[in-house]
């Protein structure tokens, strides 16, 4: 117990899209993971307006922070730092989280850590499977991202090996669900139908898998078009669309390419661990095929539980705790939200506080020695 | 599509609104990618569906490209301010996918491109593009350069 008490206690705030997430972790131990579905399913179905999402974050922010602290059974005064997603994401939505994090950090006299949303998606696995192996190969797949990333140190070195050149994997699921009239979001419902379908019923194309194609980039736009056309032809012929087979065959095409490229990247780079994160990591077929192919290649697969794969505050807290543990410089008070923060920047250190500066934090909150919150 | 986008870049200037329509997979994002190359803007032009809108700043001194997918927007956009973008629209080239009935109020002047692809399970990769210029801005503009 004494040991774990020495680990950094960090609160993390995530508002990059339409979930307001607040998590509390101590080192690599999850204490609380509060998520306010700021935009309910009904509203999501009708669509999302960024300005509306920002307002919803604003309303949910303080109650969600209070809930997370209560759930964790800790006092805000005991925190060692406040971490927040600084980007990438929706500009206005990010701004709400960043502003809240600054206000709490300043009032409490705690260091502030602006961190990268994608690096957080990787680091969250520490809460599930313990410290990340170094290096770690990560496949991040969600509605907004599809990337292969190699990290030797999640707080300072994340290298993009490849990414989608058109649609994200999760987006392809949403769009095909739209064509099949299955509703939004498309991932879970296609997963469900696919379980009763034949993944080999229809040979849909595997994008960017030719010998001269970029080895680690993805493309799902051509697949999307091929599936849409196949469905159109069935409908035009007055035939019934076999939803289960289309779902299974489409899903197979997506997860085949994702897992094939991820395993290849591991082999090429000599990495024996693969972590999969992001909302699409909840897909049952992706998990199964990744497991099968990783086992065959002697690679250890790490996939966090679904609730930690989708956007949440715990992942931000996990990366924040790692920043504290590794003595990374805190962010300045003028930290801004950056909707296109590059994946190569795991966090946004303050100016004039080099990485690893042992007293980085102290400088940053000199202005707030008084604890205004208590 | 990509080449058409590059040619389109030569016609456009700050403040212009381009509306793209066409089936899923018609090539709207591909055309926009060519447009981005033609305008010389930063970043890979990928689908903006998830983030609704993405801003690509110019690498030179040209206008930034604002790429919008209006599909998930629930109602009309009375004001583009609702998108929370940190650029001025009158200084940008704006491309909107799935914007019919949603963004017309933004400006009288707009260039409409409708991309038609063969429907059904076919190897027919030909796309037909119908270009319509609306408003004063396009009344006298020569869009024939798009035909190459």
From Swiss-Prot, chain A:
Q: Where in the sequence does UniProt note compositional bias of the Low complexity kind? A: 337-352
Q: Which reaction does it catalyse?
A: L-threonylcarbamoyladenylate + adenosine(37) in tRNA = N(6)-L-threonylcarbamoyladenosine(37) in tRNA + AMP + H(+)
Looking at the record, which segments are called Disordered?
337-374
**Keyword field contains Protein biosynthesis:** no
GO biological process per UniProt: tRNA threonylcarbamoyladenosine modification
Q: Which cofactor does it need?
A: Fe(2+)
Task: Identify the enzyme class.
Answer: transferase
Q: Where in the cell is it found?
A: Cytoplasm
Q: Where is the composition biased (Basic and acidic residues)?
A: 359-374
Show the PROSITE patterns listed in the entry: GLYCOPROTEASE (PS01016)
- Chain positions recorded as Fe cation binding sites: 117, 121, 311
Which Pfam families does the record associate with it? TsaD
So what EC number does this one have?
A: 2.3.1.234
Binding locations of substrate: 140-144, 174, 187, 191, 283
Report the main location listed first in the record: cytoplasm
Q: Which GO terms describe its cellular component?
A: cytoplasm
* GO terms assigned for molecular function: iron ion binding; N(6)-L-threonylcarbamoyladenine synthase activity
Q: Which key words are in the record?
A: Acyltransferase, Cytoplasm, Iron, Metal-binding, Transferase, tRNA processing
Q: Does the keyword Transmembrane apply?
A: no
The UniProt note on the cofactor reads as follows: Binds 1 Fe(2+) ion per subunit.
Alphabetized CDD domains for the sequence:
ASKHA_NBD_TsaD_bac
Highest taxon in the source lineage: Bacteria
The Swiss-Prot or TrEMBL record describes its family as follows: Belongs to the KAE1 / TsaD family.
Q: What functional role does this protein have? A: Required for the formation of a threonylcarbamoyl group on adenosine at position 37 (t(6)A37) in tRNAs that read codons beginning with adenine. Is involved in the transfer of the threonylcarbamoyl moiety of threonylcarbamoyl-AMP (TC-AMP) to the N6 group of A37, together with TsaE and TsaB. TsaD likely plays a direct catalytic role in this reaction.
Q: What is this protein called?
A: tRNA N6-adenosine threonylcarbamoyltransferase
Protein's organism:
Streptomyces coelicolor (strain ATCC BAA-471 / A3(2) / M145)
Lineage in the entry? Bacteria, Bacillati, Actinomycetota, Actinomycetes, Kitasatosporales
Gene transcribed to yield this protein: tsaD
UniProtKB/Swiss-Prot annotation, chain B:
Q: Where does Mg(2+) bind?
A: 29, 97
One record GO biological process: tRNA threonylcarbamoyladenosine modification
Task: Give the subcellular location.
Answer: Cytoplasm
Q: One Pfam annotation, family name?
A: TsaE
| Amino-acid positions noted as binding ATP in the UniProt annotation, renumbered to this chain | 25-30, 125
* InterPro entries named among the record's database cross-references: P-loop_NTPase, T6A_TsaE
Q: What UniProt keywords are attached to this protein's entry?
A: ATP-binding, Cytoplasm, Magnesium, Metal-binding, Nucleotide-binding, tRNA processing
What's an example GO cellular component term for this entry?
cytoplasm
| GO MF assignments | ATP binding; metal ion binding
Give the similarity note: Belongs to the TsaE family.
User: Function, please?
Assistant: Required for the formation of a threonylcarbamoyl group on adenosine at position 37 (t(6)A37) in tRNAs that read codons beginning with adenine. Is involved in the transfer of the threonylcarbamoyl moiety of threonylcarbamoyl-AMP (TC-AMP) to the N6 group of A37, together with TsaD and TsaB. TsaE seems to play an indirect role in the t(6)A biosynthesis pathway, possibly in regulating the core enzymatic function of TsaD.
User: This protein is called what?
Assistant: tRNA threonylcarbamoyladenosine biosynthesis protein TsaE
């Amino acid at each position: 117990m004494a040991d774990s008490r020495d680990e950094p206690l960090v609160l993390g705030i995530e508002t990059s899209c339409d979930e307001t997430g607040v998590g509390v972790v101590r080192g690599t131990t999850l204490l609380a993971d509060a998520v306010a579905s700021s935009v309910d399913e009904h509203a999501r179905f009708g669509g999302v307006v960024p300005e509306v999402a920002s307002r919803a974050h604003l309303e949910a922010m303080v109650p969600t922070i209070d809930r997370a602290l209560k759930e964790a059974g800790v006092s805000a005064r005991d925190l060692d730092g406040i971490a927040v997603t600084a980007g990438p994401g929706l500009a206005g939505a990010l701004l709400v989280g960043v502003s809240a994090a600054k206000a709490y950090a300043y009032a409490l006299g705690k260091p502030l850590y602006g961190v990268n949303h994608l690096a957080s998606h990787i680091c969250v696995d520490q809460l599930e499977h313990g410290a990340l192996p170094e290096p770690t190969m990560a496949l991040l797949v969600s509605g907004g991202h599809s990337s292969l990333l190699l990290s030797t140190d999640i707080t300072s070195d994340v290298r993009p090996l490849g990414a989608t050149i058109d649609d994200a994997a999760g987006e392809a699921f949403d769009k095909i669900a739209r064509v099949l009239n299955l509703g939004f979001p498309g991932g879970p419902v296609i997963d469900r139908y696919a379980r009763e379908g034949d993944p080999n019923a229809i040979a849909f194309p595997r994008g960017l898998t030719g010998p001269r194609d970029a080895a680690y980039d993805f493309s799902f736009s051509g697949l999307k078009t091929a599936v849409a056309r196949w469905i159109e032809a069935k409908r035009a012929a007055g035939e019934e669309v076999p939803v289960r087979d289309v779902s299974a065959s489409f899903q197979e095409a997506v997860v085949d390419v994702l897992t094939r490229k991820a395993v290849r990247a591991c082999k090429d780079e000599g990495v024996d661990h693969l972590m999969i994160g992001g909302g699409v990591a909840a897909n049952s077929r992706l998990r199964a095929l990744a497991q099968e192919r990783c086992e065959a290649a002697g690679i250890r697969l790490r996939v966090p539980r679904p609730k930690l794969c989708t956007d949440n505050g715990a992942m931000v807290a996990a990366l924040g705790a790692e920043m504290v543990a590794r003595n990374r410089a805190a962010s300045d008070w003028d930290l801004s939200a950056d909707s296109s923060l590059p994946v190569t920047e795991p966090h946004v250190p303050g100016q004039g506080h080099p990485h690893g500066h042992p007293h980085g934090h102290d400088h940053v909150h000199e202005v707030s020695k008084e604890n205004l919150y208590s | 599509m990509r080449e058409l986008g590059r040619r389109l870049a030569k016609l456009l200037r700050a403040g212009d609104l381009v509306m793209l329509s066409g089936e899923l997979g018609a090539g709207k994002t591909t055309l926009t990618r060519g447009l981005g190359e033609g305008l010389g803007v930063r970043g890979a032009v990928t689908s903006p569906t998830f983030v609704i809108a993405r801003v690509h700043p110019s690498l030179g001194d040209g206008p930034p490209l604002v790429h919008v997918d209006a599909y998930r927007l629930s109602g009309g956009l009375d004001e583009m301010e609702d998108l929370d973008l940190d650029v001025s629209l009158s200084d940008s080239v704006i491309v909107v996918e799935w914007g019919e009935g949603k963004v017309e109020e933004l400006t009288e002047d707009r260039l409409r491109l409708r991309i038609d692809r063969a429907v059904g399970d076919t190897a027919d990769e030909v796309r037909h593009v119908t270009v319509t210029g609306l408003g004063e801005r396009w009344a006298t503009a020569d869009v024939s350069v798009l035909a190459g």
